[in-house]
Amino acid sequence: MCGIAGFFGDGDRSAVPAMLSTLRHRGPDDLHIVSGERFAIGATRLSIIDVEGGRQPLTNEDGAVVAAQNGELYNFPTMRPLLLARGHRLETRTDTELLPHLWEDVGEKLPEYVDGMFALAVWDGPQRVGLLARDRMGKKPLYYWLRGGALYFASELKALLAIPGFSRRLNLEALHHYLGYKHVPHPHTIFEGVRMLPPAHRLVYRPGAEPIVSRYWALSFAPGSKSVSDEPAVIDELLTRMRRAVGRRLMSDVPIGFFLSGGIDSSLTTALAAEVAPSRIKTFTLTYAGEATTIGKEQDRRWARWVADRYDTDHHEETIAIEDYPSSLRKILRAFDEPFAGVVSTYFLAQRMAQHVKVAVAGDGADELFGSYLSHRLAAGAQSMPPGMDGPDWEWRAKLLVMSDEEKVELYSPDVRAALAGVSTREHVRSAFECLTARDPVNRVLEAEWRGMLPDQVLTFVDRLSMSHSLEVRSAFLDTEVVEYVASLPGSLKIRNGETKYILKQSAARYFPEDMIRRPKEGFLMPITQWVMGGLQPWVRATLAPERLALHGLFEPDRVGAMVDRVYAPGADYRTVNKALALVIFQEWYEMYLGR
């Protein structure tokens, strides 16, 4: 794992050390740059495999091809002997060394041959061509910015902000979508001119030409050809694939830990790891002090302890309190470099885990694969539609946004309202549903969220918040062979008779008791709604005070004030709190990045 940064073309070579210095949290063990005519590629390294010999960037035999990556290539053990058999000379045990040699054999098709979580950069000097690529699921981030005759790239936005002359201009369209989704959807970023490379895409750059961005892999949710009427056979196949996926994620020369929330996803990952790991595993649970125990989190802790005892793990419990959230918010926002109002509990658990391990395995991706959210239950007809939620699936999905387009427009100042005329997050949702491969209602919503919410929100918070503490997180549910198999299953195996994640629960029943499996989902969430409505009220009101909103003039202060009042009025609901929280986080972000 590492952070990468650099440029292709006529870039400023002196900017690269400054770019990399902002990424030391992603790679505190080493920093190295390789540069030449029309390129510079640098990497900060978190040493996990071949600790002594795996320094990046790496080259082919004659140094003509240079490559670096952020991530892990899980098919490295099978690819390495193939390259050796073809006459390539590999001098380390690191997976990154595959890249320059594989480029020599397959060129721009390189991403199709590697499997794992990665963001990579390759420069071929003789051919004068550069390649950027991002993994299939979107686990690892990669941003790029065109300036003059150069294409700059980096693992995080902060590295691009370090380039001399970078202009920090707010992307109003990205802001508009953020207020609906709680995150900025790719390929947008909050800064004008900067793009995020989408998951499963590559970018090919030749000096003097426009970069070419193309998809190299697509996940199909179309029904598979094999019969799925034999439920035990489906469970057998799923567990076999999951067992292999967990095994691949144990590849490391340093200690590994496991997230263990007490829910099915992380518990099953832990159970499978206990079967295949060569030694006793470490598990970690986040708990909440005080009032949080009244909203179900005590059940999470109880079941996490049960799993830890059942599989004899080296178990650790870490506790956070209400005051930890506002005091850490600016550090959290610096991890994202963008406003982000999604889950941030990973920050606190990763902070504690990093004191014990360098690598962690988590259960993220299971909700989006098997169906767990309100939108999934609505699609299955497992929950009656609330008033006004009838219509096409994309339409009622749009109604689940934190703020509608109309609500946002009501808050905007006249200038912003005019600048955003014609921009619609509702239309953004509709367009996402237009290109789906799935036909049954559950899989249609799962596919839409797989393309959007998973990489833009779930995997974003997992990566940024863990890597801010130099902790690499791996996800067994996001293994390619697991994902492709589950995507091919009908929605009726994912949500059945109102039960979410049906086939996953049936699989977990081979390991856990019924009362654990069938209990209500809590999720890896902080009790932020209760905190905002309770002890955080002074902080919310102070952050959204008129004098602070005047720093940018984007919103009408009286209308924002009225929204805040509704949060603290009798009968306030989760959605109302989320609207105010999205504004609070944007305000904090603005003051940090654009307020001077």
List the predicted regions and their residue ranges.
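Cysteine-centered catalytic environments shared across enzyme families
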Residues: 1-335, 509-510, 515, 553, ...
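Adenosyl-5′-phosphate
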Residues: 1-4, 85, 162, 171, ...
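A mobile, often basic/glycine-rich helix-loop segment
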Residues: 138, 370-395
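Phosphate/ATP-binding catalytic cores across multiple sugar-kinase/actin-like superfamilies
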Residues: 236-257, 352-356, 360, 453, ...
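Short glycine/serine/threonine/alanine-rich loop segments
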Residues: 313, 338, 454
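Short low-complexity, flexible loop/linker segments enriched in glycine and/or proline
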Residues: 330-334, 375-378, 531-533
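Divalent-cation
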Residues: 344
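Short acidic/histidine-rich active-site segments
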Residues: 357-367, 371-373
